[in-house]
Amino acid sequence: MVCNLAIDAYYGCMADFSHILMTRPDFGDDDREWLHQLVADWQVIADLSFADLLLILQNGEGKYIIAEQCRPSTVMSLRAEDVVGNVVPESLCAELDAAMDSESVFRSSKLRTVGKAKVCNVYAPVRHNGKMLGLVVRETNMATRESNGRYESESISAGKQLYEMIPRGQFPYRNPVMNQRHNARVADGFIVLTV
């Protein structure tokens, strides 16, 4: 992972989500609020999917920056280090450009290596009020897909359904389901309701 020294210097060694959002003056308050709601609620997707999530935005200079990350509580994370504020390597930019142009979930054509793990990247474009804001990357360690039982298979399927709602603007929910956001924990169990 390549670290952007200019961003580190600008933010004083450690970038945070709010500061990264400030590099985008074209984002309105509504856009920022949508992204804040997304990262407040996305833990359930990481947990159900057994995958790390990254929110990638383009900064004011057009470089792809990791704006936020989410580690799953249901499986070991791929990343021990904090990658918020890091510039995405040039080798991934063409794939990110293609994902930004996609109307739905976009799957990487090749596996990547993160640490010692083989990883499949899947990208969900984040749009709000017709404006492209960025991408949520689901980084799946392929070792977690080798021998799944029914619980794991159902969990992955439910996580995939929620993840696919992001490009459609259906996740996060506009109104919180409970009085507080991010209450539920997948490890306690889950129920899938179909209508």
Where do the PLM segments sit?
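Short, positively charged and aromatic/hydrophobic N-terminal segments
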Residues: 3-10
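Short, compositionally biased low-complexity segments
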Residues: 10-21, 66-72, 133
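Juxtadomain coupling helices with adjacent low-complexity linkers
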Residues: 14-27, 135, 139-186
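Non-catalytic N-terminal regions of enzymes
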Residues: 22-31, 54-56
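Sensory modules in modular signal-transduction proteins
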Residues: 31-54, 167-195
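Short, basic/aromatic recognition patches
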Residues: 39-40, 92-119, 163-186
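Structured interaction and signal-relay segments at domain junctions
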Residues: 42-106, 195
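Sensory/regulatory domains in signal-transduction proteins
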Residues: 90-154
